[in-house]
């Protein structure tokens, strides 16, 4: 039997650990840490995600404000709102919900949001600190993967790890976090010619390729740890599936994350943790 790495359970633990930190912050500074979310347009899925983030904030005692902008919002108008949030001392974390309407530049957003308030840890400034080994916060999804490994006491030090995917959101920061945990890391991508050969040598494989059901049993060695970051609505019967053919892992992998219920729940939990951490850092050092 493959051990199911339950991200919902780990996320619950992370949220519970934040409750006393939020309460202490309130007691000390007279307000709760605040996450401000900016959403542009009427994408239904995005609005559901934003609503879930607000609910998650409120459940642990944080506050969340949602800035809902019409689809025709100009780049200048969006930039003005982000600048205002950057300069608002009552705002600790800023999150811009992607995707943006096509006429808006995500590049501009990633340049403009202050690293000191970047709750996602994905702006260019934030990633600069991160890759220099001086992170203000870590990108949410890779940090969530590390929390899962920690929760289940899965050893990383000295292990061979492969990360499939090289995005700034998951792949590259994931490789760095594993390296800092003293794993020997190989980063694979769409141009890797011998990917299956490499993944079959790994003790731990993190798959963030963005391609549904890309890897299966034949791509992993016996008793490997498999972390599936992918999420797609193209599974059998329209069900959610990941980048890994999960049903093939039973009796082969030692442990694996399911989709849904694996890495996904960790992303919001780490967003809350990042916001709390940024609030604490800003409160300790007003010049931060």
Curated annotation (Swiss-Prot):
Against PROSITE patterns, the record matches this protein to:
THF_DHG_CYH_2
Ordered alphabetically, the record's keywords are:
Amino-acid biosynthesis, Histidine biosynthesis, Hydrolase, Methionine biosynthesis, Multifunctional enzyme, NADP, One-carbon metabolism, Oxidoreductase, Purine biosynthesis
One biological process GO term for this chain? methionine biosynthetic process
Q: In which pathway does it act?
A: One-carbon metabolism; tetrahydrofolate interconversion
SUPFAM superfamilies from the entry?
Aminoacid dehydrogenase-like, N-terminal domain, NAD(P)-binding Rossmann-fold domains
Q: Name one GO cellular component term.
A: cytosol
Q: How does it assemble?
A: Homodimer.
Q: What does this protein do?
A: Catalyzes the oxidation of 5,10-methylenetetrahydrofolate to 5,10-methenyltetrahydrofolate and then the hydrolysis of 5,10-methenyltetrahydrofolate to 10-formyltetrahydrofolate.
In its UniProt entry, what is this protein called?
Bifunctional protein FolD
- Organism from which the protein derives: Bdellovibrio bacteriovorus (strain ATCC 15356 / DSM 50701 / NCIMB 9529 / HD100)
């Amino acid at each position: 039997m493959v051990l199911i790495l339950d991200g919902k359970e780990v996320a619950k633990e992370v949220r519970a650990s934040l409750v006393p930190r939020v309460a202490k912050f309130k007691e000390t500074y007279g307000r709760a840490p605040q996450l401000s979310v900016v959403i542009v347009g009427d994408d239904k899925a995005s609005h559901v995600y934003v609503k879930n983030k607000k609910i998650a904030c409120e459940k642990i005692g944080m506050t969340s404000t949602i800035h809902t902008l019409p689809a025709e919002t100009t780049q200048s108008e969006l930039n003005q709102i982000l600048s205002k949030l950057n300069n608002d001392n009552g705002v600790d974390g800023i999150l811009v919900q992607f995707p943006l309407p096509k006429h808006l530049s995500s590049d501009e957003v990633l340049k403009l949001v202050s690293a000191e308030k970047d709750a996602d840890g994905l702006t260019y400034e934030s990633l600069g600190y991160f890759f220099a080994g001086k992170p203000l916060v870590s990108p949410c999804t890779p940090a969530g993967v590390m929390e899962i490994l920690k929760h289940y006491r899965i050893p990383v030090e000295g292990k061979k790890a492969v990360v499939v995917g090289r995005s700034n959101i998951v792949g590259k920061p994931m490789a760095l976090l594993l390296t800092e945990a003293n794993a020997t890391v190989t980063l694979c991508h769409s141009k890797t010619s011998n990917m299956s050969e490499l993944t079959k040598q790994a003790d731990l494989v993190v798959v963030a390729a963005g391609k549904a059901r890309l890897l299966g049993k034949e791509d992993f060695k016996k008793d490997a740890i498999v972390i599936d970051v992918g999420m797609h609505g193209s599974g059998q019967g329209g069900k959610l599936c990941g980048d890994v053919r999960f049903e093939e892992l039973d009796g082969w992998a030692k442990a694996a994350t399911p989709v849904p219920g694996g890495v996904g729940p960790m992303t919001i939990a780490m967003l809350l943790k990042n916001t709390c951490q940024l609030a604490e850092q800003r409160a300790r050092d007003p010049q931060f």
